[in-house]
Amino acid sequence: MSPRKTYILKLYVAGNTPNSMRALKTLRDILENEFRGVYALKVIDVLKNPQLAEEDKILATPTLAKILPPPVRRIIGDLSDRERVLIGLDLLYDEISEEMLGSAELDTLADDDIASPDS
């Protein structure tokens, strides 16, 4: 099995609002359960650092951006749906691909063991 990738994420919020805090809590729960030890999360308050939001072309909050590994992906708005967050950032796809790769290798081995009718 290959080493796990490191995920670099940025969460853009607007102040200490209930919506911002809910987005942060949900995201931290997802990351700690699914990616413990292989992620870095930077929380950016666009009210305190508007230049960062402008540089990254952030127009709405909350916005979650996966910076690494490429490609960059963004989710804008509600982050309460775990599956939506993982799919939107291509994180669930990576997880499923690794699981399926293991299964595909087993299927290939099994197919090779089956004798053809010609033999």
Curated annotation (Swiss-Prot):
Source species of the chain: Prochlorococcus marinus (strain MIT 9303)
UniProt function note: Component of the KaiBC clock protein complex, which constitutes the main circadian regulator in cyanobacteria; it may modify the ATPase activity of KaiC.
Protein name from the UniProt record: Circadian clock oscillator protein KaiB
Comment field on protein domains: Has 2 forms, fold switches to a thioredoxin-like fold (KaiB(fs)) when bound to KaiC.
Gene name for this UniProt entry: kaiB
UniProtKB keywords: Biological rhythms
Other facts noted in the record for this chain: The kiaA gene has been eliminated from Prochlorococcus during genome streamlining. It has been suggested that the central oscillator in Prochlorococcus does not have to be as robust as in other cyanobacteria because the former live in specific niches of the Earth's oceans; they divide exactly once a day and at the same time. Thus gene loss and changes in kaiB function compared to other cyanobacteria, can occur.
Keyword Nucleotide-binding: no
Quaternary structure (record): May undergo a major conformational rearrangment; in the free state forms homooligomers. When bound to KaiC switches to a monomeric thioredoxin-fold (KaiB(fs)). The active oscillator complex is probably KaiC(6):KaiB(6).
Record-stated family: Belongs to the KaiB family.
Pfam families with a match to the protein in the record: KaiB
